[in-house]
Amino acid sequence: MRPDQIQPEMYEKQLQDKQAELAKLMATLSLPEMEVFASQPTHYRMRAEFRIWHDGDDLYYAMFDSADPRTPIRTDQFLAASRLINELMPKLLDAVRDVPVLRYKLFQVDFLTTTTGEALISLLYHKPIDAEWNAAVQQLNNAFPACHFIGRSRKKKQIITRDFVMETLTVNGQKFHYQQVENSFTQPNAGISEKMLEWALDVTKEASGDLLEMYCGNGNFSIPLARRFDRVVATEISKVSVNSAQLNIAINGMHNVQVVKMASEDVSAALNGDVELPKSLVQAGVSELTPSVVLVDPPRAGLDDATVELIRKIDSILYISCNPETLKANLEALSNTHEVVRYAMFDQFPYTHHVETGVFLRRKAS
């Protein structure tokens, strides 16, 4: 993304263009009216990554145009990023510029912030980081007491205080707390994330019984939805995300959610009866689980055939998609057994062609 792509005066038009593109792609499917959830036009991203460009005595943040990836675009401020990131950007450079051990071979800075004012700053180097660097970054941390710092160089990660922030999302007036770990997946647009959670709660308001969730991440959906169901069993392949999910379940006081570390393909094979149930699923009580709803939030590749066959067996499907093309293919595969009753577009990534889509399906009457 180029910084000049952020044009607040064009926000509504780009939103309408996205809506039209999504409607065109999905035109061959039988869908209800699209619900559209707009983002804030500026300061919506809670995380951002910048290259660091060294030009003589000068030092500045840089972004690049994919059409010209060799030419840096000086980025002193970034309207897409949170206000806290924009506040920290010049202060950090001023603090690093005259400290050789912090400046030398620094090539990237990553910011992760929260709605509650926390910040985690990762400094990435093309050199080893050593005791001298550690002493200097400790002094830097003293100058930024509300921030946490991480140093990264080849095969090394140095944590100063901690490598995560605690985010709070407000959903229908209720606050939910989430650990978000550096370099792990979280939705970048907190405002849209809150709207997605509210929508998920709304479409499942008549649900009962149990929930099966696949690709649960850090428990983003699992935790608010837990109050809708008797039991929730959620699966996730990333060890870091599983650990965060378990912590988040505890700090939010949820006692009916269990998270299992397992790839979706293995979950599908086990629950479809193709292989024996692994011990982790047995311990989670999957044999006694009676899901009325399954929630899937797959990567851009969408759902594999075995997972489609698994979720086909469940009466209601809540599908969160980051790729409308693979979503369309999966919906076509499910069309013989299920119909879409709710359909929403979430502008998680303004000024880009990317969208998040949510659909809620119910089994067709026999």
Swiss-Prot record:
One of its GO terms (biological process) is tRNA methylation. S-adenosyl-L-methionine binds at residues 187, 215, 220, 236, 297. One of its GO terms (molecular function) is rRNA binding. It catalyses: uridine(54) in tRNA + S-adenosyl-L-methionine = 5-methyluridine(54) in tRNA + S-adenosyl-L-homocysteine + H(+); uridine(341) in tmRNA + S-adenosyl-L-methionine = 5-methyluridine(341) in tmRNA + S-adenosyl-L-homocysteine + H(+). It holds the Pfam family tRNA_U5-meth_tr. Coiled coil: none annotated. The active site is at 322 (nucleophile), 356 (proton acceptor). Dual-specificity methyltransferase that catalyzes the formation of 5-methyluridine at position 54 (m5U54) in all tRNAs, and that of position 341 (m5U341) in tmRNA (transfer-mRNA). This is tRNA/tmRNA (uracil-C(5))-methyltransferase. The gene is trmA.
